Amino acid sequence: MHVIIPARYASTRLPGKPLLDIAGKPMIQHVYERARQSGAESVTVATDDERIRQACERFGAPVCMTGAQHRSGTERIGEAIVRLNIRPDDVVINVQGDEPVIAPALIRRVGEALARQTAASVATASVSIDSDDEYRSPNVVKVVCDKNGHALYFTRAAVPHARGSDTLPATALRHIGVYAYRAGFVGRYVSMPPSPLEDVEQLEQLRVLWHGERILVCQVPIGEAPKLSIDTPADLARAREQWKALTAV
């Protein structure tokens, strides 16, 4: 099992996001340290940015430099897999660089789920939504699954819709952006044309479903789900405040 953390500097809403300081460390360092605790055989940061490379090398993270043309983290990982000579049958886990408190157990859980599952090309995770604000936020990605735990759709919309009721649906699930793939599948993914849905929702995983591949979704306990995914300046401010509270205990 290998973890690759794709990192780019040019975030639209938070430029330089991987290097933003949280509790005296760049965000990417928190993610790397969590990934190291998962028991993965290797943990590598994949980036095209020299500033990110230099920051990672200062705290000892291996870095794979990639091209700047990639449209998604998975495409960047595809190049890194080739450069790192990872075997086609090996499980590769994509840990997003904006999850500074991702649980090592969650990384391991998703990787092991794919290793056991031959019917799916990808594994990811979800958690029950417990607030109406989260349910209705376009910054929170929702997932709908079939009875076997395979994804039917991912969206930023509030789904499933409870017709005739204002009550939060008990089946509402928040997608957690960690992915496990077999290395050989990533090469196929990169060669697949992007789907119209992927472009509309700006969700790279929709390419997998559009082309008829299965995504296994592991539903995890609320306590294991990351609480500090950082996409906006408000998220960053909240993360810094929560970190202060954690260290003050």
Question: Where does each model-flagged region fall?
Answer:
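N-terminal glycine-rich phosphate-binding loop and ensuing alpha1 helix
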Residues: 1-47
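Short, structured coil segments at secondary-structure junctions
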Residues: 39, 59-60, 211
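Short, high-confidence coil segments that cap the C-terminus of an alpha-helix
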Residues: 40, 88-89, 117-120, 213
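A conserved hydrophobic position in a structured secondary element of the catalytic/binding core
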Residues: 47-48, 102, 181, 231
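Short phosphate-binding loop-to-helix
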Residues: 50-112
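Conserved core of the sugar-phosphate nucleotidyltransferase
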Residues: 103-195
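Conserved alpha/beta core of the MobA/IspD/sugar-nucleotide pyrophosphorylase nucleotidyltransferase superfamily
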Residues: 168-249
